[in-house]
């Protein structure tokens, strides 16, 4: 399951990037970003990597909670 709060968190620490801006840079719809943030959609590996690169974090930081790493 996607950790929905992490994408939103990293969007905001990256200059308060909007869902639309992140979606545009990632090549997906704004609705897709909203669904990822809401935990309703798990991104493909390609999209997870793309989002992590745009946001400047690792895939693990973006999608794996601390509990899952233990």
Label each region the model flagged.
Residues 6-25:
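Short basic helix-loop element that most often maps to the first helix and adjoining turn
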Residues 19, 30, 45-48:
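Helix-turn-helix DNA-binding elements, focusing on the entry/boundary residues of the two helices
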Residues 28-42:
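Recognition helix of helix-turn-helix/homeodomain-like DNA-binding domains
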Residues 40-50, 69:
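Short, basic-rich loop-to-helix N-cap that marks the start of a DNA-contacting helix
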Residues 46-61:
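DNA major-groove recognition helix of helix-turn-helix/homeodomain DNA-binding modules
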Residues 53, 63-70:
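Short, charged recognition helix plus adjacent turn
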């Amino acid at each position: 399951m996607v950790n929905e709060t992490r994408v939103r968190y990293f969007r905001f620490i990256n200059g308060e990037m909007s869902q639309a801006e992140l979606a545009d840079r990632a090549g997906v719809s704004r609705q897709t970003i909203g669904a990822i943030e809401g935990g309703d959609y798990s991104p493909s590996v390609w999209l997870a990597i793309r989002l992590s690169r745009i946001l400047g974090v690792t895939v693990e930081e973006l999608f794996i909670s601390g509990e899952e790493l233990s």
